[in-house]
From Swiss-Prot:
It holds the Pfam family EPSP_synthase. PANTHER family: UDP-N-ACETYLGLUCOSAMINE 1-CARBOXYVINYLTRANSFERASE. It catalyses: phosphoenolpyruvate + UDP-N-acetyl-alpha-D-glucosamine = UDP-N-acetyl-3-O-(1-carboxyvinyl)-alpha-D-glucosamine + phosphate. Coiled coil: none annotated. It is found in: Cytoplasm. The keyword Membrane does not apply. NCBIfam families: murA, PRK09369.1, PRK12830.1. The lineage of its organism: Bacteria, Bacillati, Bacillota, Bacilli, Bacillales. Cell wall formation. Adds enolpyruvyl to UDP-N-acetylglucosamine. This is UDP-N-acetylglucosamine 1-carboxyvinyltransferase 1. One of its GO terms (cellular component) is cytoplasm.
């Protein structure tokens, strides 16, 4: 079993560079299927297990995909298959993002119902609502969702009941080849939506208003391969901001975009963290004492749900009572029990978590319950007494590139080991970076 073993007590200092955004690259790779002429070349692509998975989905759909040196080249000019099977989709719910492009290109798509992190139900009903509004017929059964259209998709006015990021992306992609104009209202506003729109426009689409609540997509007859650079990962940047703050360290986070981090920055400054915008990125200096705050996750530009668990780790070190309320996903508090194993004073009340601090955390063996929880448990381990062993690293690998190595370079006492091979002695870990 692979584990990350971390010993607490080190202030982290230095420089770290964030990768291209996981939440941007996956829908962009899926949208590359829309190009029936030429090759798409994507740069700043992070080397993540989810990227390998979506690439395999595209290959199964008959696209040619080459991934090397943080660059993905995609040729989808051949006739595409219409089915994304369970063996791929079960690993990652973002696989459902191929549905819109397939429906637009082929008039038909058959996708296994998605997997990914076990965070509530996370239904795809808003995706399907959009496809139906554009003239598609949708059937769900036997573990698959199938959509087909006679002729071609037609532009429509679509109102999302919730500003779902995935639904906004999928509908926006499908609408690029629809006949007429699609107006998508109550659309998600995340930076990753803007990045996808920029990529679609580079291919020849006509998308306007991305980043606002109303997006207009004027359909075109054909899309072409293009070059595109993926935006930096704001969630990885936020995670390293917490690493600096929680250890009282001083970290320059290169390649971070300050405009994408406003809600995170606001809450951390409220806690007493010093944040300086520099030409290279964002510098974060942790205080001697953290102040308690309340946080409510919201769609962008509100506080991102993907930073909830990391901030929970930070608030466990704050002086006073803090509360985090989760409004985006249900059942995203599974990591609370793992924090309790580390001696945290923390409890769940409905859709909120109450924390009393500061906590003297104790190292323990804990299991990552999802991607961001994996990072949060490691962050908590940075300030725990003794050794923290984090298992279920498959979650971590879905969203972070060499996370333990980046932390080690900043001064953390941390190692990733495979205990199938041999039991790792605590002394061996304590000797790291001595």
């Amino acid at each position: 079993m692979e584990k990350i073993i971390v010993r607490g007590g080190k202030r982290l200092n230095g420089t770290v560079r964030v990768e291209g955004a996981k939440n941007a690259v996956l829908p962009i790779i899926a949208a590359a299927l829309l190009a029936s002429d030429g090759k798409n070349v994507l740069s700043e692509v992070p080397v993540l297990s989810d990227v390998y998975t979506i690439n395999e989905v595209l290959r199964h759909l008959n696209a040619e995909v080459v991934f090397e040196n943080n660059q993905v080249t995609i040729d989808s000019s051949k006739e595409l298959n219409i089915e994304a099977p369970f063996e791929y989709v079960r690993k990652m719910r973002a696989s459902v993002q191929v549905m819109g492009p397939l429906l637009a290109r082929n008039g038909r798509a058959r996708i296994a119902l998605p997997g990914g992190c076990a965070i509530g139900s996370r239904p795809i009903d808003q995706h399907l609502k959009g496809f139906e509004a554009m003239g598609a017929k949708v059937q769900v059964g036997n573990g698959f969702v199938e959509a087909y259209v006679e002729g071609e998709l037609k532009g429509a006015k679509i109102y999302l009941d919730f500003p779902s990021v995935g639904a906004t992306e999928n509908i926006m992609s499908a609408a690029t080849l629809a006949k007429g104009t699609t107006i998508l209202e109550n659309a998600a506003k995340e930076p990753e939506i803007v990045d996808l729109a920029n990529f679609l426009n580079a291919m020849g689409a006509k998308v306007r208003g991305a980043g606002t609540g109303t997006i207009r997509i004027e359909g075109v007859d054909k899309l072409y391969g293009a070059n595109h650079s993926i935006i930096p990962d704001r969630i990885e940047a936020g995670t390293f901001m917490v690493a600096a703050a929680i250890t009282g360290g001083d970290i320059l986070i290169e390649n971070a975009v300050p405009e994408h981090l406003r809600s995170i920055t606001a809450k951390m400054e409220e806690m007493g963290v010093k944040i300086i915008e520099e030409n290279e990125g964002v510098r974060v200096i942790g205080p001697d004492k953290l102040k308690a705050v309340d946080i409510k996750t919201m769609p962008h530009p509100g506080f991102p749900t993907d930073m909830q668990s990391q901030m929970m780790a930070l608030l466990l070190q704050a002086d006073g009572t803090s509360m985090i309320t989760e409004t985006v996903f249900e059942n995203r508090f599974m990591h609370v029990e793992e924090f309790r194993r580390m001696n945290a004073d923390i409890k769940i009340e409905g859709r909120s978590v109450i924390m009393n601090g500061p906590n003297s955390l104790q190292g323990a063996e804990v299991a990552a319950t999802d991607l961001r929880a994996a990072a949060a448990l490691i962050l908590a381990g940075l300030v725990s007494e003794g050794y923290t062993r984090v298992t279920e690293l498959k979650h971590l690998d879905r969203g972070y590139v060499n996370f333990h190595k980046k932390l080690a370079a900043l001064g953390a006492t941390i190692e990733r080991v495979n205990e199938k091979v041999e039991e790792v002695k605590e002394q061996e870990v304590s000797d790291l970076h001595a």
